[in-house]
Amino acid sequence: SVVEKIRALGGEWAALDDAIQARGFLDLVSRITGIPDLLYDPWYFGGGTHENREGQDLDPHVDFNRHPVERWHRRLNLIVYLNPEWQDAWGGSLQLHSDPRAPDDRVSLVTPLYNRCVIFETTETSWHGFSRIALPPERRDLSRRSVALYFYTRERPAEELADTHSTIYVNRPLPGHLQAGHVLTDADVAQLHIAVARRDQHNERLYKDLSRLNAQLEQATAALHAGRLGRLRYFARRVLARFQGSFMIGPG
């Protein structure tokens, strides 16, 4: 679950919201990262409090690269973990990938322990995610909790520029033991069902994105036709039709 409007939670959350938008804090993060003129996101798009439970995971991905409203460049992820107790063996540890599409993908793990802060740049290669949470039966009351803060700039270096995009996911590969001749176990079948369902979810998300873009294109086209240029095109088509009609041969 996600709560983007953390200020509405009151108390310490409101104090956190005050702290991260203060110029002193933004300048400190700029000094640490070398990225000047950082901007706080008052909308917390995609950020805020995050909580994940047993069986959940997050496929490797790079984040959306422009602010949906301000069109700022997204530059930094800052994640603070809120878990007094966690082990890598339970899954859910942050995975930083070199390239999840590559056979030799290198993965670094960060255990999501309480008060641990991770800062990394948001680029076209900042692949990250976390593996499926599989808690021991006696610890199923636990959840993976964090607060995610994203920071922006009005400009970014030319060599880092890319077309505007939403979050880009890469589906996890099938387990290495699933080879020809292997007899599927119940666990294997369950894992295959999960993999297929995940791909279906990504396809559905892409179809929705395409439908939304098509609707926006249709609205823009309608607005253009309704304007002066649209009226000129309409009259031009009428004149052309009459001109062509004058040379048509009538029925015999």
Regions found by a protein language model. Give the residues of each.
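A short coil-to-beta-strand element that immediately follows conserved catalytic motifs
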Residues: P36-G46, W90
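Non-heme Fe(II)/2-oxoglutarate
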Residues: S1-I32
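Catalytic core of Fe(II)/2-oxoglutarate
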Residues: G55-Q56, D63-R74, N83-L224
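Amphipathic alpha-helical recognition patches that constitute DNA-binding helices
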Residues: G48, N77, S146
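Beta-rich nucleic-acid/ligand-interaction surfaces
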Residues: F45-L58
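Short acidic (Asp/Glu) patches
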Residues: G11, I32-T33, D59-R66
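Helical coiled-coil/dimerization "stalks"
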Residues: S211-G252
